[in-house]
């Protein structure tokens, strides 16, 4: 009996009488290794399987004809020539004509371990055609199945099984049931009420139908009914004629009159049961108290009602707020009081000096009158201060810039090498009401033991601006410059001595290039040179610094 073997160059192999020694490689040994725990798990899994179904399948396949068995496993039937010849021959002759398909164990192992594609085809049925030669192609014309053809074979097997069971693929295909023909018919309710349930016998009543009369006609009708019933006071108080509230009773009367507007107005006005749900008119005093409380407490209507508007309920205050916010009165209120806008909420690098100057001048002028609070108008600024503020022009600013003395030439680093007496015991004078806001606190680099321009507090201090040593030889020239200016009238600027407005450097060596000083004074209308010290000592210090860096 000739034994089949695989050629080294052909994956399918051919029949040969030569025997080859099988030497397993390292990869084969790696895959062949198995752990004892894995074997025990597989044995436990096999014990739980039911092999009765497999035995029944094998017995069924043993009684099947050869053609049906080949078709069941995906093989094509034999060609007619072979079929005719086999029909006339006996089973023993047919067995003699078949090739010898016995395989050596080594050849089977080589076929199983030759690759990943062939590992999946490890059944004996798949191996049978792989070892046949061209002589067996007449009986088995179909070669070994590959992975690409496996899906098609599975589909054909499924179709064969469906055909054997008597169900066509069209019958097994699911269909989405959408359409009128799939809707269920719900029969009328034929149940009975329980003993505790009460049968609903009342008839529902239509109160309003909005699709009959135009919306503009309905609004005119509601306005007319509100004017006839005395609600015109509220309409005059809150932007007359622009906002209309729904009146269900008036709409119901219009429906009962078959949408006859004239008849509905007469019946609604003559009917004593006509609803007066609209809020009563707010007096001018109540409106002013509400607006004043809104500035103090915000939208806390409980505090508004408790402290200012005690004649109204909290609900009435809330309703009035929403109607008042849509009126022209709110626009006037917001314009006069800046309601809803946070003051001084500007860009960090921009300060509204004039706005703050006016506001702080009002605060120094005394308490605001009660009449000014109720009318929500700020107290008028005194004429003297207005004249001073209006006197500032571009020429004044130019004069202020030119009047400030330059310490030295910015291009000369060693310009301030002269000695300067220490000022450790010099008292500090405080300046009140200098409405200047810090825009940027300048930090200059230091070198060696000297701290270059360290301000201990923000404010203005006494100093003697004589020749002083502010730059050391070791210190480097800073990249930033300190700029300051004095915002006062020119006449006052000529009288005030610079010695009264200085900086105490606490006996430190500092490095400053081309410094200028800036002071903004509010109450300077009647000041003179003799009254400067009194002005400086009579006010509290404002913790602000006027420093601008270039």
From Swiss-Prot:
Region (Disordered): 1-60, 113-170
GO CC terms in record: nucleoplasm; nucleus; protein-containing complex
Stretches assigned to the ELM2 domain: 174-272
Subcellular location(s) of the protein: Nucleus
Pfam families named in the record: ELM2, MIER1_3_C, Myb_DNA-binding
Chain positions with Phosphoserine modification: 52-53, 114, 156, 165, 168
Keyword check for Nucleus: yes
InterPro entries from the UniProt entry: ELM2_dom, Homeodomain-like_sf, MIER/MTA, MIER1/3_C, SANT/Myb, SANT_dom
Feature: compositional bias, Polar residues: 121-134
Annotated ranges, domain SANT: 277-329
Record field: compositional bias (Low complexity): 1-16
Modified residues (Phosphothreonine): 163
Comp. bias (Basic and acidic residues): 17-36
Cited SUPFAM superfamilies: Homeodomain-like
UniProtKB keywords: Nucleus, Phosphoprotein, Repressor, Transcription, Transcription regulation
GO BP field: negative regulation of transcription by RNA polymerase II
Superkingdom to which the source organism belongs: Eukaryota
UniProt keyword Signal, yes or no: no
Record GO terms (molecular function): histone deacetylase binding; transcription corepressor activity
Biased composition (Acidic residues): 154-163
Physiological role: Transcriptional repressor.
Protein name, as recorded: Mesoderm induction early response protein 3
